[in-house]
């Protein structure tokens, strides 16, 4: 039943003008919700500042103008052009046999001659690497009680075997209460409530970034702390205890995610789309466990000194003072 419903959406959607108008209102409300949440908005601002006018630099939700100007024909033509069998991946997790799933999917997708559709696979271009040699600051004025910042730089691409070391480095720097930045910014100085880091991998590049929300009067101090911590780790690496804690946290998070069938389904589907194969879960855990202090020192020394980009949402009208901090 579920496969029938989903396959019907994929193969036989009519996409009426009424449907588009109804969804347009929903997306506009989603944009409004994003704009009212500075901690969310700052990530889109960072992407725009870092990647500029590229596919990955533009907001996934679109803009108010682009959503308002989107016609039914635009949506329908995109659907007919992109929703093709050669780009389709079906991922299923649960108590069901693989052969039965294959038979059900083939039967469902054979309707309306969907499997006979021809077309070129969707182009997945490499993500552009930031090529500016100058640091950049993206600033969005918003009258708020807190300043929200995202400080990031170039990371590794998704096919880079160092992505496991990058994940451990990210966790050690800002992955939890024992992480270096959390301790320095929140526990020692009480400058922020929310402090975290994450690494993202794309086709041709990646991003390693750090978020903090703080009192606007303390924003420069927080930026300076981030820079000092990253500089220290780039020069000296991290302690054995920090690395082992981070590895344990990354492994634990992955294991817990596999308790849910939906998460398992998402993992194998994304693996197939991104890598063309499903990486064995135990192999992933082993790859994380193999990350050494030398790996962390090398990747930190290479990437934490990259030219930074800083995105800020808060009651600031001039980015010059932040540019001066980055230039030091």
Regions found by a protein language model. Name each.
Residues 13-31, 97, 118-130, 228, ...:
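Acidic/histidine-enriched alpha-helical segments
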Residues 4-6, 46, 83, 151, ...:
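Active/ligand-binding-proximal structured segments within catalytic/core domains
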Residues 2, 101-104, 181, 222, ...:
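Hydrophobic side chains in well-ordered alpha-helices
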Residues 1-38, 76-84:
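Active-site-adjacent, His/Asp/Glu-enriched structural segments that form or flank metal-binding
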Residues 52, 56-61, 65, 84-85, ...:
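An aromatic/glycine/proline-enriched structural segment found at the starts
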């Amino acid at each position: 039943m579920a496969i029938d419903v989903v396959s019907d959406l994929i193969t036989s959607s009519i996409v009426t003008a009424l449907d588009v108008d109804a969804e347009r209102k929903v997306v506009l409300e989603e944009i409004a919700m994003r704009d009212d949440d500075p901690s969310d908005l700052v990530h889109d601002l960072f992407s725009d500042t870092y990647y500029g006018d590229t596919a990955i630099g533009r907001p996934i939700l679109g803009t108010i103008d682009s959503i308002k100007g989107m016609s039914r024909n635009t949506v329908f033509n995109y659907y007919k052009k992109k929703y093709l069998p050669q780009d389709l991946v079906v991922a299923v997790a649960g108590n069901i046999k693989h052969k039965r799933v294959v038979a059900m999917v083939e039967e469902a997708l054979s309707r309306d001659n969907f499997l006979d559709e021809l077309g070129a696979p969707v182009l997945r271009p490499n993500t552009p690497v930031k090529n500016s040699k100058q640091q950049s600051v993206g600033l969005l004025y918003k009258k708020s009680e807190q300043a929200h910042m995202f400080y990031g730089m170039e990371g590794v691409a998704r096919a880079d075997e160092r992505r496991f070391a990058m994940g451990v480095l990210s966790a050690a720097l800002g992955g939890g209460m024992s992480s270096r930045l959390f301790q320095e910014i929140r526990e020692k100085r009480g400058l922020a409530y929310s402090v975290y880091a994450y690494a993202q991998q794309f086709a041709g590049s990646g991003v390693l970034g750090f978020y903090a929300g703080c009192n606007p009067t303390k924003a420069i101090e927080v930026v300076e702390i981030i820079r000092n911590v990253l500089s220290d780790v780039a020069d000296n690496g991290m302690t054995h205890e920090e690395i082992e804690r981070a590895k344990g946290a990354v492994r634990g998070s992955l294991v817990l995610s596999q308790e849910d069938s939906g998460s398992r389904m998402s993992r194998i589907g994304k693996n197939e789309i991104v890598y063309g194969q499903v990486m064995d879960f135990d192999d992933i855990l082993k790859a994380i466990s193999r990350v050494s202090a030398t790996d962390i020192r090398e990747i930190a020394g290479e990437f934490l000194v990259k030219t930074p980009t800083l995105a800020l949402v808060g009651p600031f009208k001039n980015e010059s003072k932040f540019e001066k901090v980055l230039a030091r």
